[in-house]
A protein has these predicted regions:
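S-adenosyl-L-methionine
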Residues: 1-18, 24-32, 46-48, 55
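Conserved Class I SAM-dependent methyltransferase catalytic core
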Residues: 248-297, 301-305
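Class I S-adenosyl-L-methionine-dependent methyltransferase module
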Residues: 35, 42, 46-174, 215-257, ...
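Short amphipathic alpha-helix with an adjacent loop that forms part of the alpha/beta core around
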Residues: 6-8, 192-199
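Class I S-adenosyl-L-methionine
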Residues: 287-333
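Conserved SAM/SAH-binding loop
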Residues: 186-192
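Conserved proline-anchored active-site loop of SAM-dependent methyltransferases
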Residues: 15-29, 38-43, 196-217, 278
Length: 333
């Protein structure tokens, strides 16, 4: 990116990360002293990214995380039967195995306790600290999940990592102050009111590549991210896996020109000078078509790299595909 833009560093730059996902890209920009505007339509992702881009590992965070972990080590969670235990573990007659009953109870207990702390310590627990702790719960829960790669299904038998007891660990140990103005959002990126609300020097886009909807593949993490008191509104859940009825459906996962139109909207509405887009040769929009669309808005180039498709199931064969990094320098900005 520095080579393309001619920048020596990201200091004093405002960077947009519009499909923040794991939050790692935003976190790296934070560590390079950039102001970061992050967004993801998935609630769990926006919380994790907030923790990576805005939150510090404070003494308050450390104290609460250690207290929650000690509570479960002292078995204070054993009588907790919350939403995750009831619907996403083999508790009683439920057959879903996203988590063991033990770990589901730990998750439910920690979520209940965190909400109680939030409501009783409103003057001492900041929003940044709350989201730091919640993000830590999310990643610690993910570390003991019983799924092949994503949460679209669970495994019939619990794998080795899933039977380990959940250990609550901080999402990071960064105590360096963030650049003023760094913000994380939880919007559909095509929301034009949202797109008009900020201005950046560069935007990085890592959208869905195929027809698999993220909400349908990560919904248990979204359920953990939501306040326990709101979860009853998610019932009834659908199907063998317990998918909620309100899953967000991204236009970037849809064929028939829908994804192309979505990209057009971003290239037109984003108030930025540079756009970098990650995509690959198996994506919905072809390389040639993407270049045609981008060229309407400015100078365009693409870098290609060979790599093997991620193998989430043993019976999948490794397939050589090309990863693309498109670069668009928008004209007249």
């Amino acid at each position: 990116m520095k080579e393309k833009t001619g920048w020596e560093s990201f200091v004093d730059k405002t960077i947009g990360d519009m499909f923040s996902g794991t939050g790692i890209v935003s976190y790296n920009f934070r560590n390079h002293q950039a102001k970061v505007i992050s967004n993801d339509a998935e609630l769990y992702s926006s919380i994790i990214t907030h923790a990576f881009t805005r939150s510090l590992y404070t003494d308050v965070c450390k104290k609460i995380i250690e207290e929650l972990q000690k509570d479960v080590e002292d078995n204070k969670h054993c009588d907790t039967v919350g939403f995750i235990t009831t619907h996403y573990s083999p508790h009683n007659t439920n057959e879903r195995k996203f988590f063991t009953v033990e770990n589901a109870k730990r998750i439910d207990y920690m979520r209940d306790r965190l909400e109680a702390i939030k409501h009783t310590h409103t003057h001492t627990l900041t929003d940044d600290e709350y989201k730091f702790i919640l993000a830590s719960i999310l990643l610690s829960a993910d570390a003991v999940s019983n799924v092949p790669a994503v949460y679209g299904c669970f495994l019939k038998h619990f794998k080795a990592k899933a039977v380990k007891n959940l250990l609550l660990q901080p999402i990071h140990n960064n105590t360096t102050a963030v650049v003023d103005g760094s913000t994380t959002y939880n919007y559909d990126v095509l929301n034009k009111e949202f797109l008009s609300s900020f201005e950046t020097d560069l935007v990085y886009l890592d959208p869905p590549y195929n027809a698999r909807q993220y909400s349908k593949n990560y919904f248990p993490l979204n359920m953990i991210a939501k306040s326990p008191e709101t979860l009853l509104s998610e019932l009834p859940l659908k199907g063998k896996t317990g998918i909620p009825t309100d899953c967000f459906m991204s236009s970037f996962c849809k064929k028939g020109g829908v994804a192309e139109t979505a990209f057009e909207t971003l290239f037109k509405e984003l108030n930025t000078k540079w756009i970098f887009l990650s995509y690959n040769s198996e994506s919905i929009v072809s390389k040639e078509r993407m270049l045609d669309i981008m060229k309407r808005y400015g100078d365009t180039s693409v870098i290609e790299r060979d790599y093997k498709r991620f193998k989430s199931y043993e019976y999948n064969k490794d397939v050589e595909i090309k990863e693309y990094l498109f670069c668009l320098e928008i004209a007249n900005r």
